[in-house]
Amino acid sequence: MPIHIIDRRLNPGGKSLENRQRFLRRAKSLVQGAVKKTSQERDIKDVLEGGEVTIPLDGMHEPRFRREGGTRDMVLPGNKKFVEGDYLQRSGQGSAKDSGPGEGDSEDAFRFVLSRDEFVDLFLDDLELPDLAKRKIAQTESEGIQRAGYTTSGSPANISVSRTVKLALARRIALKRPRKDEIEELEAAIAACTDEDERVVLLAELEKLMAKTKRIPFIDPLDIRYRRFETVPKPVAQAVMFCLMDVSGSMSEHMKDLAKRFYMLLYVFLKRRYKHVEIVFIRHTDRAEEVDEQTFFYGPASGGTLVSSALQAMHDIVRERFNPSDWNIYAAQASDGDNSYSDGELTGLLLTDKILPVCQFFAYLEVGESGGSAFDLSDSSLWTLYERLRNSGAPLSMRKVSERSEIFPVFHDLFQRRETSQEKAAP
């Protein structure tokens, strides 16, 4: 017999959820492009709120069948501008509201409001952590055990006493099994009875209750329940992202704003995209400290600059909490490129000997003043050091930003989906 399931859940906001999802699937590339364009002009907080995007109306046409009388290739008579073989281009200069006759076709647009979740999903759709594969384990999942309700058979060690007693009580009530106090009252009445005829009736009633008690046991084998467990796949590949940020005195408010925006976007990306990624926030001046999210983004700090302090702090945390044989380790660093001259050698040693050998990927973001005039001069000492390491084959990517509008494209470039090492090795 067929089973019919009717979903009577209300659509959100009185809208057709099925039509909305169908539209997003069909126009995904157009909507995604509009999201990327809109996000470049937004604040991170605005990105999380969703909003209105605009896509070309021409991209909304659905395929349909129509009659066609054959293919014709001709130029109608009466024009002095075109000949056979010319391409006709859309003018695009008019508007739907004010263009008059003969002023060209308008570029109509379709405005669509995205929810918070839809906006973030589309923006992060083609981003991922590079090479997310545990290097010493080929498989990506292992078997784990978790509770999965109850069963009528199992090991005595797994008996659920509470569930068994609950089911037994429900069965006794349903079958009206005589209670102990009822039997005791009847026995007391028999002992106190002096009338022989009445005593016979009471004895017959007692015998009836005792027989029913035997037929309906206190706990029946059908009542017994065992805790049930089942094996479920558990991810083996674990990832941890270290966020390193320079908050020293050489970092202007504009630079700190750029760095914070980059890390806020990274934080949203990781929390939204992956369930099994841990994030460690480390900020540094001439000394480094691990802080929480609120302090990392909004806590005031200033001082000198020693990049090695942040790298040393990261190394210590990796050694204590994140075994490289079990964890995929990623790091993203934001700085203005300034570093103490005496700290350069130690920074290089920490990177080459301690940090990069255990990292799957290391991203360096160098922030500058608005206009990027400083980037036109010679490279910073930190940029020169990192560039040398990158050219030697280290898993390191580098970018420079000086404007808010550059944060999103740079972030997308750093974390766009790439071929994994297994895919590259495959024939």
Swiss-Prot record:
SUPFAM superfamilies: vWA-like
Region (Disordered): 86-107
Membrane-spanning segments: none
InterPro entries: UPF0229, vWFA_dom_sf
Family, similarity comment: Belongs to the UPF0229 family.
HAMAP family assigned to the protein according to its UniProt record, in alphabetical order: UPF0229
UniProt xrefs under NCBIfam families: PRK05325.1-2
Matches recorded under PANTHER family: UPF0229 PROTEIN YEAH (PTHR30510:SF2)
Name the UniProt record assigns to this protein: UPF0229 protein bll6755
Species of provenance: Bradyrhizobium diazoefficiens (strain JCM 10833 / BCRC 13528 / IAM 13628 / NBRC 14792 / USDA 110)
